Amino acid sequence: MRDFRNSLRTLLKQPLFSGIVILTFALGIGANTAVFSVINAVMLRPLPFRAPNDLVSIALYDMKEGIEPPTDSSAVSYPDFVDWRAQNHVFESMAVYVNRSLTLTDGAAATHLQGEAVSAALFPLLGVQPIIGRAFLADEDEPGHRVAMLSYGLWQRQFGGDTGVVGKSITLGGEKFQVVGVMPARFSFPIGDFPPEIWTTLSILRATRDGSRPMTEERGNDFLKCIARLKPNMPIQQAQANMDTITAALRKQYPDSDANLGMKLWPLITAMVADAHPALVMLCAMAGCVLLVGCVNVANLLLARSLSRQRELSIRAALGAGRWQIVKQLLIESALLGAGGGLAGLLFATWGLDALKALLPPRIPRINEISPDIHVLVFTAFVSLLVGALAGLLPAWRASHPNLANSLNDTSRGSSESARGRRTRAVFVVVEIVLALVLLASAALLGESFLRLQQVRPGFDSASITTARVALPESTYPKPAQAAEFVRKLLANVTTLPGVNSAAAAWWIPLSGSEITFNFDVQERPLPKSEQPIAQVNVVTHDYFKTLRANVVRGRDFTPRDDASAPRVAIVSEGFVKQFFPGEDPIGKRITPNGSAEPGDPPVREIVGVVNDIHLISLRDAPKPQIYVPHEQFAIQSVMILVRSHDDPRFVGAALRDAVNEIDKDVPVYRVRPLSDYVSQSVAQPRLNALLVGLFALIALLLAAAGVFGVMSYSVTQRTQEIGIRFALGAQRGDVMRLIVSQGMRLVVIGVAFGFAGIFALTRLLQSLLFGIGATDLTTMLGVTIILGLIAFVACWLPAMRASQVDPIIALRNE
């Protein structure tokens, strides 16, 4: 306790020094605490389910591609799922689920609900029970059952928390569903950017109103997500081997649909964070670099401070203080500084987390759970003590070995620095330069990558377009002709609104992150279904390309005459033509998109036009081959409406709701937002990477510059008498300035050389995050080297200016 009080008293006597060290620590610790808070919530915090480590996601991939599947859960057909469930001996249970939005029409206005159709086994598999009511029963997956489970938020918002709602019927999509339970407040599954508000069983998928074959009977129609719970003590490798055997048997048994399917098991948490994982790892590494720069900077400051205290420490040693006592005293001081930096860093991180959450892409799971918890506090405390100890260890050890004779005889200054001390401080400066260069290069590469991504032409003009989704209840609009008639009336009403230039409808809009792909056949060269190529398919109305300002480069656009009674037609993208009709005129070619949503045998469609490529998923990836079909010939109940108008999107959204209500008040309008938001969202992750790494690089650059300035300033102070002698012997001011600057820039050059090696080592980490630029781009490397060199030169030049103004008489007076 006495050592603690003495250390605290010593630090309080030097508030400027203590404040600089605490601020330096706080910048590094704050950056790491903020990043760790995200990693803790997204990746490390256990999922809120029973034995979450036993939960796995099952992903399918095309074996023809020869690559592993992405780690986010892909889809499976219901017949394949049934076979997996029956034949495996490694899972305790399995379940599937799929997004199934519903419309609640019991209130004054139709309300869109984010819903999921799930296996009855899902909730027991997750180990979560409703807070009131019961879970789904196994037989409620069968056709004819209409039961629903409410989320806690929907229960409170729509039903006022009335416990009597359990057992009552509500109207969803024009049908009566019995509410059987309410889930806990913190429960959400699947975990994502659109949390479910209501769950129904698979029974709603296993029957159709028009008598067509339901999707759940079509092997090869992969639309369900699949998870499973491993049996106790079952290694995932053994489960993988068992499922590989089953999948191989299915490939032989069903060659038309399963011939090329492979299957991969992933831990559920791994699958959930797959998209965010590379960026989070990179941010963690960059934040660690900032902390290391700060640590080295503080070590340099403590080393200089210990040298100025050599006389004090020598007196202590002469009076009987042992080396351990001196080391302990100095380590306590550095630990206190680290603790102060930790508290300030935690405050910085808390302030910055709200801004960080606003910048994070919405597709990153569990964003709302990001907050400092006990794990974050423990991490901050550990890092604070660790950096305090690391920064103070070498200075403390060096200070505990004083030369008593020199220290006690020196009455003019605390002590002169040894050659070993100068080398140590030089090494610290080199390390700071290396880390600063690595961070600067990373920030420049990510920034250039982001700029190039923004320059990608998406194939459409998003300005002044408002989008919204309209979902028609299947009970009211069971037939395609009814859906087509509704959309036709709606667009006719919308196009007459003031300020509206054009309007259209589509299955999916560009850069929404969603797609539908169909196998298709070319009439002139038919192939077995397992060998048929795949293309993105979109269902659009005749003004779709006009509204997007996309260009029909060959042939014609769709017209109102392309209705259900007209010959079946299609428009394809330029990429489609390049891949499947190279050197040929595609107009008049006949293709057959094998879409399961189309009743009966899929019709042959004649290609009547070619449109420019449109980025449907992301700007980063090249557009896939695309097929467009007229909505009148392939009418669907859920469409996105696009309205080109210079009015505020809020006004357009309100006018669109009024137009829908004029036709049918039980049809909801939701997700009203500008198309430009989707474009911005598609580059949210690269933008975040560039911003955060740029901020970290700026901090590291300032700390490195401060380190160079501090070392050179201290060197000038230590060499004052030497400089005075040089002046006395005839040296000019320019000579002294060149001496000091060259000494500092020599360290910078060494740091840059090692920094390039560090940049090349980071190539693998950065490459997956870059677009249109290599991780070792020489122009970028040269640019950041020049920037770092100029700032380091200024940091050397300022002490050199002070050295050139030394008065030789004053400098030599003590000699």
Regions inferred by a protein language model and the residue ranges of each:
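Alpha-helical transmembrane segments of integral membrane proteins
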Residues: M1-S18, L268-V273, L302-K328, I332, ...
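Short, strongly hydrophobic transmembrane alpha-helices
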Residues: Q14-V42, P46, G294-C295, A339-G342, ...
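Mid-to-C-terminal secondary-structure elements
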Residues: S101, Q114-L137, R146-V281, S442, ...
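Small-residue-rich transmembrane alpha-helices
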Residues: V38, A299, A335-S407, E448, ...
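Short juxtamembrane loops and helix-capping segments at transmembrane helix boundaries
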Residues: I39-L55, M63-E65, F194-S212, G262-A274, ...
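Membrane-helix entry/capping segments
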Residues: M1-I20, A109-H112, D141-G144, E217-L224, ...
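Interfacial "coupling" helices/loops that link adjacent transmembrane helices in transporter permeases
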Residues: G294-G338, A706-V748, V752, L765, ...
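Membrane-proximal extracellular/periplasmic loop immediately following the first transmembrane helix
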Residues: L47-S101, G220-K225, P458-N519
